[in-house]
């Protein structure tokens, strides 16, 4: 009886039973997808802002709020959720891959005595996992950018993808399979910048707040440090993000691409639209970052609790 009770509370060897890695990866992807449902409108507004005024044209939107109200007026409530299927697939591929790579590398680099990797090594692991996940998620990213951009174009110029799978099939058939990875370099670069900026700015912000004497090491301090970290991360990654967005949305003109590479995008944006146009869409990008992270962890915790209650207890 005692042995049975011990096995029920934990494993046969008395150790606590934990979720399999495959379940953890699955839950990570599902949690990211759940959060995306809530922040998709912010992603759409950010993408529209980054494409507004492209090529020295008159800006379609003055502010992020103007963009949101214009989209609602012209395309309705469903319009702000355009590209949701692509956003969900991006999370399913990017988040799951990133989590899987991070876990594998973390375990490989953990010492034989159980000593975890140091801060710098964890940063390298995080950036490597982020870049790999971004590469795998690039096809969904291309579909997302094009689907969210469609509504701003005249009807005869729209691509008219029905959903993310229709987009991927048509892109492959009409432009070649390599087009699915168009902009993968800036996409991977953004992931590296985001991971590096988040790690460095969060720890520094937290230490600064604690040293000020006004904060203790509690949830308020963590929240404020997260907000500062989000601000730094957004500022650092937006120029790379606008390069990614424009490359993935560009068309071929007389057989030639609108942009040669990410640097060409940055030079043209600064030349024709002004230096600060590199940060177009800053508000929705920053507003998306915090809620998406918080919601992802909330969903992840709830799924883990439910799994333990249903399959690991008793």
Swiss-Prot record:
SUPFAM superfamilies cross-referenced by the UniProt entry: Mitochondrial carrier
Pfam family, one: Mito_carr
Membrane topology recorded in Swiss-Prot or TrEMBL: Multi-pass membrane protein
Residues annotated with Phosphoserine modification: 6
Residues where Phosphotyrosine is found: 102
Recorded catalytic activity of this chain's protein: (S)-malate(in) + 2-oxoglutarate(out) = (S)-malate(out) + 2-oxoglutarate(in); malonate(in) + 2-oxoglutarate(out) = malonate(out) + 2-oxoglutarate(in); succinate(in) + 2-oxoglutarate(out) = succinate(out) + 2-oxoglutarate(in); maleate(in) + 2-oxoglutarate(out) = maleate(out) + 2-oxoglutarate(in)
Consequence of changing residue 239 to T: In PPGL6; loss of protein expression
Residue positions where N6-acetyllysine is found in the record: 73, 256
Annotated signal peptide: none
Subcellular location: Mitochondrion inner membrane
TM region(s), chain numbering: 24-42, 83-101, 119-140, 183-202, 222-240, 281-300
Post-translational modification N-acetylalanine, affected residues: 2
Keywords from the UniProt entry: Acetylation, Antiport, Disease variant, Lipid transport, Membrane, Mitochondrion, Mitochondrion inner membrane, Phosphoprotein, Repeat, Transmembrane, Transmembrane helix, Transport
InterPro entries the UniProt entry points to: Mito_Metabolite_Transporter, Mitochondrial_sb/sol_carrier, Mt_carrier_dom_sf
Modified residues (N6-succinyllysine): 57
PROSITE patterns associated with the record: SOLCAR
Cellular component GO terms held in the UniProt record: mitochondrial inner membrane; mitochondrion; nucleus; plasma membrane
GO biological process: one example: malate-aspartate shuttle
Solcar repeat extents: 23-108, 117-208, 217-306
Function: Catalyzes the transport of 2-oxoglutarate (alpha-oxoglutarate) across the inner mitochondrial membrane in an electroneutral exchange for malate. Can also exchange 2-oxoglutarate for other dicarboxylic acids such as malonate, succinate, maleate and oxaloacetate, although with lower affinity. Contributes to several metabolic processes, including the malate-aspartate shuttle, the oxoglutarate/isocitrate shuttle, in gluconeogenesis from lactate, and in nitrogen metabolism. Maintains mitochondrial fusion and fission events, and the organization and morphology of cristae.
Involvement in disorder: Pheochromocytoma/paraganglioma syndrome 6: A form of pheochromocytoma/paraganglioma syndrome, a tumor predisposition syndrome characterized by the development of neuroendocrine tumors, usually in adulthood. Pheochromocytomas are catecholamine-producing tumors that arise from chromaffin cells in the adrenal medulla. Paragangliomas develop from sympathetic paraganglia in the thorax, abdomen, and pelvis, as well as from parasympathetic paraganglia in the head and neck. PPGL6 inheritance is autosomal dominant.
Subunit structure: Interacts with SMIM26.
Full protein name: Mitochondrial 2-oxoglutarate/malate carrier protein
Organism: Homo sapiens (Human)
Lineage per the UniProt record: Eukaryota, Metazoa, Chordata, Craniata, Vertebrata
Gene name, Swiss-Prot/TrEMBL: SLC25A11
């Amino acid at each position: 009886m005692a042995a049975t009770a011990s096995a029920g509370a934990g494993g046969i060897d008395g150790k606590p039973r934990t979720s399999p890695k495959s379940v953890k990866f699955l839950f990570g992807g599902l949690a990211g997808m759940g959060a995306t449902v809530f922040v998709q409108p912010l992603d759409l507004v950010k993408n529209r802002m980054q494409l507004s005024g492209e090529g020295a044209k008159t800006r379609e939107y003055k502010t992020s709020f103007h963009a949101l109200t214009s989209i609602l007026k012209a395309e309705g409530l469903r319009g702000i959720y355009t590209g949701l299927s692509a956003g969900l697939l991006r999370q399913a591929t990017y988040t799951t891959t990133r989590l899987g790579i991070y876990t594998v590398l973390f375990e490989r680099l953990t010492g034989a005595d159980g000593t975890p990797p140091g801060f710098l090594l964890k940063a390298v692991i995080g950036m490597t996992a982020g870049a790999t996940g971004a590469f795998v998620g690039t096809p969904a990213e291309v579909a997302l950018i094009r689907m969210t951009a469609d509504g701003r174009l005249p009807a005869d110029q729209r691509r008219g993808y029905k959903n993310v799978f229709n987009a991927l099939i048509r892109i492959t058939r009409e432009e070649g399979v390599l087009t699915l990875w168009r902009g993968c370099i800036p996409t991977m670069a953004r992931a590296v910048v985001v991971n590096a900026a988040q790690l460095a700015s969060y720890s520094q912000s937290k230490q600064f707040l604690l040293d000020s004497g006004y904060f203790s090491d509690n949830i308020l301090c963590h929240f404020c440090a997260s907000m500062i970290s989000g601000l730094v991360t957004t500022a650092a990654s937006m120029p790379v993000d606008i390069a990614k967005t424009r490359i993935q949305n560009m068309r071929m003109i007389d057989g030639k691409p609108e942009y040669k590479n990410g640097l060409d995008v940055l030079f043209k944006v600064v030349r024709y639209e002004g230096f600060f146009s590199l940060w177009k869409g800053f508000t929705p990008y920053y507003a998306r970052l915090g809620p998406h992270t918080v919601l992802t962890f909330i969903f992840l915790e709830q799924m883990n609790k439910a799994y333990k209650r249903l399959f690991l207890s008793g």
